[in-house]
Amino acid sequence: MTKLASGIVILALASTAIWAAPAFAQMGKSNPGSGEETRSAPGGADIKLGDAKPIAPPKIEADEASRAPILDEGKAVESFTVLTRSADGKVSRSSPSEEMRGLVIEDMKKEAGKGSMKLEKSGDPSFANEEEAGRQVFGPDDRVQIQNTKVFPFKAFGYIEAKSKTGTGSCSGTLIGPRTVLTAAHCLYSNDDGGWLTDVLFAPGLNGFEDAPFGAYAAESTSIVEGFVTNYQGFYGSVVPWDLGIITLAEPVGDTLGWLGYSNYDGLGDFTANIVGYPGDKDPPALMWRATCEVVAENVGTENFGYDCDTYPGSSGSSVYAYDEGLKQRVVVGVNIAESPEYNTAVRLNASYVALINSLWK
């Protein structure tokens, strides 16, 4: 794999200040859920899945790094303005707080891998037990099907459908709170296809269109950062650092199913990445698959990191998580967003994004 900075679009920020003390945002801790029976999905039998075309991960072309926008501190801060669309179509705008302003500027000055908060890495113990994970390998493909999606952590991962101007698309997402789902911004907003996607649904633990063990849940609202819209210059590489989205569900399904934790490890280096989602190249569709690969420190940037885990259309929005042996928890450190000629790409949960998620967490 090639060093991250050479092939992936990294946010170009004009700043001459030296790197200062690390900034932290309070991490979100995981919760395995109550295990009680879930409530009926909003709309019940009226909610139907299966008409969607998997949303392809945007491609970062080789020349896009040189065309990425160069932002000063003020523009970078304003890029973290939150845009929220409610289910009835109303869009609100929330400017960054003073705390957020400080974190964004701090993140601009950081050097990748330089920090005191380290990940005590280990493999996810769920994958060490084939019976628990219900896994099956097909041919040379290193992705693994999760057959038992009704156990934690797999019931915290879900299938997303949403409507654009030209059709219905599917992505993947992860519960990180009772009503909070983490995904990619391009699963919620299309710069090339009319803006906001509508009628967003989340089906946790989906195991094929005929087996939705926990139902499908409607979004109360969806949120992205304004930089994903205002910094777009006609090519995806111009908005890579802002490709993170939040779905707020109308129902607190996470209280029952549980959710994953999330954090900004400012000293993030080598670690084992786990990606669980719904790639669209498998038949039958809408089955849950996982991919695992090693991320090397040289491919970890301050806003993004690269890896060679297999991902396909439909995998967009999947969380990238690591197992922290010290915490004995699965911790989300990024979101799978794009592909490039050399490797796949995640937006990294830095201090700014963790604070943003905390502000929207429900």
Predicted regions mapped to residue ranges:
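Bacterial N-terminal signal peptides that target proteins for export
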Residues: M1-I8
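Bacterial N-terminal signal peptides
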Residues: V9-A17
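Sec/Tat signal peptide C-region and signal peptidase I cleavage site
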Residues: I18-A25
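Protease-domain processing segments flanking chymotrypsin-fold serine proteases, especially trypsin-like
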Residues: A25-L175
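Conserved catalytic-core segment of clan PA serine endopeptidases
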Residues: Q136-K155, E161-T166, Y189, G194-G254
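Catalytic histidine site
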Residues: F152-L201, E294-V300, A322, A346
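Chymotrypsin/trypsin-fold serine protease catalytic domain
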Residues: V240-G314, N344, L349-N358
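Catalytic nucleophile loop of clan PA
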Residues: D310-N336
